[in-house]
Amino acid sequence: MGAETVTAILDTTLGVVFTWLGWKTAKIIRKYTPYSYPNARINAMEAKLLTGQRFNELAESRTLQNFIVNLEDTDYKVHLSGVTEDPLEIERAFERALASTYLLMEEILPKRVSGFFRLLLEEWDVRNIASVVKAKVRGEPAIDYVVEIGTMVPKVKAIAEAKTMEEILVILEGTPYEEHYQRLLLGEIDVDQFETELYKVYYSRLLEYATSRKEEERLILEEFVRTKIDIRNIVTLLRAKRAGLPGEVIKRHLIPGGSVKLDTALNVDDLGMALAELDSTKYGKVLRDEREKIEKDLTLVEPVLQNHLLRRMEELTRFYPLSVATPLSYILKKEREIKKLRAMAKLIADGFEPEKIKEIIGEELA
């Protein structure tokens, strides 16, 4: 083989290598660079989350007026501005703060994932529609149940003000919820099953979005959604077992798409046996660690599982620092913070002593 031939082969090989390196570098830049600014901003926001010490200070407020004043140096100031010492007004101010967080994520994140955070807002659509329709069925003032958050607030208000149940069907026309409301009107399902069907629509849309992404974005979003479904299903299962409901009734209220099978747990006799069946799932350890408390107070199940999801998102954030795991982790922390603030406002309004508030906030909602 002549020198010219060897040189030509080397040139060709080097050309292929450099082309591949250029393509690979461009792919990495295209994949990760869009997360640099938003994730840096989110990390700065995370540093401003309230500490345990700050919650202890807030617990000393004693009045809702002091509670609001003590939050004036936080990002909640803009949402609490003009709010009276009404626990419901304060609760809704915190809900607006959470909604603004979702909208900010949609605004600053890469377009290939930003739509997911818009979809997350649709959970308030489901909550609003279900709450308002339930109020209508019970003959209660439906407007009292409207929370002005979500993507369908005008429609929700129109539903609340509707004169007849049939009028609501017209308002929901063209939405993903029209079909299920029609089934409710026809008597094919009751109002509780109607709510479940709305959540099935919501989670199916989230899961469809997650599975349409690529590589780690799909991995992270899909695990997030499937875990959220698992949490809802486990909470539903355990509450139903405590109430003594049969498996076939419980099954109708479970959301498809979760990562764990609950068929065996559906057919056991009581809450303790249901928890024992869950022991073999990936949630077994976290539930086992808190089992004694959970059996006494089922409201602890959801925060225990939510904390598990948060820890998992934090793990993925460390493994994929420039990814959608960072905003998801932050959202979960923000939700937990707002849940604590809402609970604290109610406890202060109910006249609980500071030490008792610290105990409740620190233990039950940690």
From Swiss-Prot:
Pfam families: vATP-synt_AC39. GO terms for cellular component: plasma membrane; proton-transporting V-type ATPase, V0 domain. Transmembrane segments: none annotated. GO terms for molecular function: ATP binding; proton-transporting ATP synthase activity, rotational mechanism; proton-transporting ATPase activity, rotational mechanism. It is a peripheral membrane protein. InterPro entries: ATPase_csu/dsu_sf, ATPase_V0-cplx_csu, ATPase_V0-cplx_csu/dsu, V-ATPase_V0D/AC39_subunit, V-type_ATPase_csu/dsu_dom_3. One of its GO terms (biological process) is proton motive force-driven plasma membrane ATP synthesis. Belongs to the V-ATPase V0D/AC39 subunit family. Component of the A-type ATP synthase that produces ATP from ADP in the presence of a proton gradient across the membrane. This is A-type ATP synthase subunit C. It comes from Thermococcus gammatolerans (strain DSM 15229 / JCM 11827 / EJ3). The gene is atpC.
